[in-house]
């Protein structure tokens, strides 16, 4: 090849091709697994500082910790232990549990009780909790009895110590998944990942973009009525 300019151009093309093939920052990676009776999924670009296996291990460990603190489906979880206390009993909550509950109580106050994490007795009565499913509506007297046990204002959280007023059954399902999503996002950012999409049971958090700078897109199930 006698044309030095053409030779140089071909070298540049070859170099660019090899670089593109080795560019992990433009590659979409995905991790997933089961959690909280549903599934979790993390999509990201780039390479985690300690590698993908270490990131997945950290994610699974974090989700397990949240389950052990806030899952009413685990009889030995912190929330189940509180729900089983006699009136006047107290429990020192794990720090994440205390933070989530404090946020939930703030939301209850801001909405004048429209949002209330003590609604567990009604959730269970209608068959949406850890109790066996039911296929008929509960009796009116059972509904009223369950309602008497509901009321966020009954709770007293002193720093991390929560006192059981008697009969209160906490259910953090409406907020725990969102907290877990934020927790996983923090793990990704700590690992040097700034472009990601985290999803747990329909709860989402996104940052940055997909490869080639494309925006993250999520599907909405049956967005059109009917």
Positions of PLM-derived features:
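Mature catalytic core of soluble alpha/beta enzymes
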Residues: 2-11, 15-226
């Amino acid at each position: 090849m006698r044309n030095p300019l053409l030779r140089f151009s071909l070298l540049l093309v070859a170099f660019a091709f090899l670089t593109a093939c080795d560019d992990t920052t433009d590659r979409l990676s995905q991790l997933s697994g089961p959690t909280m009776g549903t599934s979790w999924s993390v999509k990201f670009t780039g390479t985690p500082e300690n590698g993908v296996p270490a990131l997945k291990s950290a994610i699974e460990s974090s989700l397990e910790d949240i389950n052990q603190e806030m899952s009413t489906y685990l009889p030995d979880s912190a929330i189940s232990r509180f729900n089983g206390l006699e009136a006047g009993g107290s429990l020192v909550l794990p720090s994440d549990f205390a933070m989530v509950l404090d946020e939930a109580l703030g939301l209850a106050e801001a909405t004048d009780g429209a949002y209330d994490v003590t609604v567990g007795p009604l959730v269970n009565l209608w068959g949406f909790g850890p109790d066996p499913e039911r296929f008929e509506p509960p009796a009116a007297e059972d509904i009223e009895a369950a309602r008497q046990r509901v009321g966020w204002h009954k709770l007293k959280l002193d720093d991390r110590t929560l006192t059981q007023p008697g009969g209160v059954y906490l259910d953090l399902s409406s907020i725990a998944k969102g907290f877990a999503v934020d927790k996983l996002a923090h793990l990704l950012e700590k690992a040097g990942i700034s472009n990601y999409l985290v999803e747990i049971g329909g709860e989402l958090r996104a940052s940055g973009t997909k490869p080639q700078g494309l925006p993250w897109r999520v599907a909405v199930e049956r967005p059109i009525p009917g």
